[in-house]
């Protein structure tokens, strides 16, 4: 499979989806979401999921494929995208679009990911020991893997221990990179902090206007307030509002603040990859410059 792949990445609220929609129509391409929350059904407004009208314009994939109670891993994502790319007719490039850096990295770098299903009972037992002891245990069985994980990063520590206890092999020995052979163009969107902050404020207000509060309320009634996805950006703040812990104005301000912090972390992640070509979506010739780059890539 040598069909070119065009990646559109960057921080949240930089206009990735809008650009992808325009380019996909010009190129007669499909759009593959690289967003870890858009895979879940019913989480629509708070994840800025493409509307049904937008999905009617261009075929979208890896959206609405899981129940909110299901676990969907990076390995699952990699498997599905790889199969999709292999089955796509070699007529035009596919567009991989989103801000979940690890999803994108799993495709463009060809990460080798341990196929170990989550072990709830094991995790519960490890969590009871505390992060300090878990990290010490990891350092004993896989010092190389522990060196790559921050001592306070409970999620990655537990995952590394989980992989070791299930397979008997340290996670560091099960990882690696096998880059794909097809050509890849990576386009990154990055605007000034002031412009991004304004877009974040506008998008937060738009989500509230579209019915984010009702969406969260419905999800809480159906799945309960302990659903892990309800602790993610945009949903956690509205949940606290619905629980009477803050006013709606406070929830809105919290979403804006947390989105800004999240965007900063995303920017740091993506800026570490030299192969990404960066564009400012607020510049006058933004679309023309992106299109010229794509034409040169496809020539």
From Swiss-Prot:
Question: Mind listing the GO biological process terms from this record?
Answer: tRNA modification
Instruction: Name the site position(s) for Interaction with substrate tRNA.
Output: 100
Q: Which cofactor does it need?
A: Mg(2+)
Q: Which InterPro entries match?
A: Dimethylallyltransferase (IPR039657), IPT (IPR018022), P-loop_NTPase (IPR027417)
For this UniProt entry, the molecular function terms from Gene Ontology, in alphabetical order, are: ATP binding; tRNA dimethylallyltransferase activity
Q: Gene3D superfamilies given for it? A: 1.10.20.140, P-loop containing nucleotide triphosphate hydrolases (3.40.50.300)
Q: What is its EC number?
A: 2.5.1.75
Residues that, per the record, bind substrate: 12-17
List the catalysed reactions: adenosine(37) in tRNA + dimethylallyl diphosphate = N(6)-dimethylallyladenosine(37) in tRNA + diphosphate
Broad class of enzyme this protein falls into: transferase
In its keyword annotation, does this UniProt entry include GTP-binding? no
Provide this UniProt record's keywords sorted from A to Z: ATP-binding, Magnesium, Nucleotide-binding, Transferase, tRNA processing
Region Interaction with substrate tRNA, as annotated, extends over 35-38
Q: Which residues bind ATP?
A: 10-17
Give the UniProt family note: Belongs to the IPP transferase family.
- What binding partners and quaternary form does the record give? Monomer.
Function, as annotated, reads: Catalyzes the transfer of a dimethylallyl group onto the adenine at position 37 in tRNAs that read codons beginning with uridine, leading to the formation of N6-(dimethylallyl)adenosine (i(6)A).
Name of this protein: tRNA dimethylallyltransferase
Name the lineage.
Bacteria, Bacillati, Cyanobacteriota, Cyanophyceae, Oscillatoriophycideae
């Amino acid at each position: 499979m040598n069909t070119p792949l065009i990646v559109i990445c960057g921080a949240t609220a930089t206009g990735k989806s809008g650009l992808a929609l325009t380019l996909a129509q010009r190129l007669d391409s499909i759009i593959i979401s690289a967003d870890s929350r858009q895979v879940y059904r019913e989480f629509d407004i708070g994840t800025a999921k493409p509307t049904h009208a937008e999905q009617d314009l261009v075929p979208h994939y890896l959206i609405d494929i899981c129940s909110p109670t299901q676990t969907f891993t990076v390995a699952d994502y990699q498997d599905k995208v790889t199969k999709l790319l292999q089955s796509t007719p070699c007529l035009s490039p596919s567009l991989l679009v989103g801000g979940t850096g690890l999803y994108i990295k799993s495709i463009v770098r060809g990460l080798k990911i341990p196929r170990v299903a989550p072990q709830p009972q094991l995790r519960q037992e490890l969590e009871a020991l505390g992060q300090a002891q878990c990290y010490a245990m990891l350092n004993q069985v896989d010092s190389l893997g522990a060196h790559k994980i921050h001592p306070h990063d409970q999620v990655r520590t537990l995952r590394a221990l989980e992989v070791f206890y299930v397979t008997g092999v340290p996670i560091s020995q099960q990882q690696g990179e096998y880059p794909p052979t097809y050509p890849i163009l990576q386009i990154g969107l990055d605007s000034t902090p002031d412009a991004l902050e304004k877009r974040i404020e506008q998008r937060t207000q738009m989500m509230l206007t579209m019915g984010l509060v009702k969406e969260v309320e419905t999800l809480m009634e159906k799945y309960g307030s302990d659903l892990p996805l309800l602790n993610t950006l945009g949903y956690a703040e509205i949940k606290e509002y619905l629980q009477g812990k803050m006013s709606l104005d406070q929830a809105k301000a919290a979403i804006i603040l947390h989105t800004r912090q999240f965007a900063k972390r995303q920017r740091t992640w993506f800026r570490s990859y030299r192969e990404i070509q960066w564009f400012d979506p607020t510049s006058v010739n933004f679309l023309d410059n992106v299109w010229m780059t794509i034409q040169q890539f496809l020539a």
